[in-house]
Amino acid sequence: LVIGLAYESQLWGAIFAPFIIGLIADRYFDAEKILALIHILGGGLLFMCSIALGFDKFYPYILIYMILYMPTLALVNSIAFRQMKDPSKEFPKIRVWGTVGWIVAGLVISYGVGWETSQTLEYTFYLSAIVSVSLGLFSFTLPKTPPKATNESPSLREILGLDALMLLKDSRYLVFFISSILICIPLAFYYQDANLFLNELGMENAAGVMTLGQISEALFILLLPLFLNKYGIKKTLIVGMLAWSLRYVLFAFGDTGSNIWMLIFGIVLHGICYDFFFVSGQIYTDYKAGEKYKSAAQGLIALATYGVGMLIGFRLAGRITDM
């Protein structure tokens, strides 16, 4: 249950994200400076996580960290989209480097330093703290992304980032929004338990093997503009959802014996699953939001996915893991 509670902390970050973004990034301060400050503060909190003794002391630090971290998911998208003329073609070429970072982290932890199984997991927080501070300092070098100038006094609705809720009046976007919540319920199981599941099955260097999913993600994100251009956003999202369903079937029947190919294929499917649903969904949200509420809209979809959907998923995953 404590594992579920730890992962669930990102829910509260996702809830606060639209408020932080709607109040600050869309109105008052340069987005890249907010991003820098959050990552630097986050580095300090991650260091405190590494030295915390017991879950009672660990949880407050990870909770505050996630409240600060979750808005960055929308902020980086907002900063990127503001610099682009055609996000559907340009964004995947930028987003792919986040995937490269994920691959490097998995390989370093699994094959490089062996922190995955050597009872030295606190070192991952040391490394994360250093990287977070470094990312914060680097964020100051990002292109200047000021809020859109306006002479109007903000309403409470605008301050809370609630204007992005107008997107839900569009029935097609509402379907996408609800689908995002639903698909993130089983996704929470994958995020929380996939590595534990593979290790319990006896797969060696599970974290390293799981980087195949990120390699796949890097390849498919580069193909995403071609797919979007040829088939459109609707078919792209449907393919992404179908890939998630197939993936869980493969994990259900896979093992480290003759059916190990099912586990490997399920991991490799991550590229289609993530890029064709989540990345294309971010592009779709940016397109539907209009110029004024781009950051708040990204916060809204973060609330649906990393907030509501993941909350339900982590609650269920935590209880099932404890059974």
Predicted segments, located by residue:
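Loop-to-transmembrane helix entry
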Residues: 1-9, 90-99, 122-126, 199-218, ...
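Helix-loop boundary and gating motifs at the non-cytosolic
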Residues: 1-14, 172-211, 278
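Intracellular juxtamembrane helix-capping segments at the cytosolic ends
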Residues: 70-85, 276-290
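Symmetry-related core transmembrane helices of the 12-TM Major Facilitator Superfamily/SLC fold
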Residues: 123-140
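Hydrophobic core of transmembrane alpha-helices in multi-pass small-molecule transporters
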Residues: 45, 55-75, 181, 261-276
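Structural signature of the two symmetry-related core transmembrane helices
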Residues: 33-47, 235-250
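Juxtamembrane intracellular "pre-TM" segments in multi-pass secondary transporters
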Residues: 142-178
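Helix-to-loop junctions at the C-terminal end of transmembrane segments
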Residues: 16-30, 113-114, 219-233, 321-322
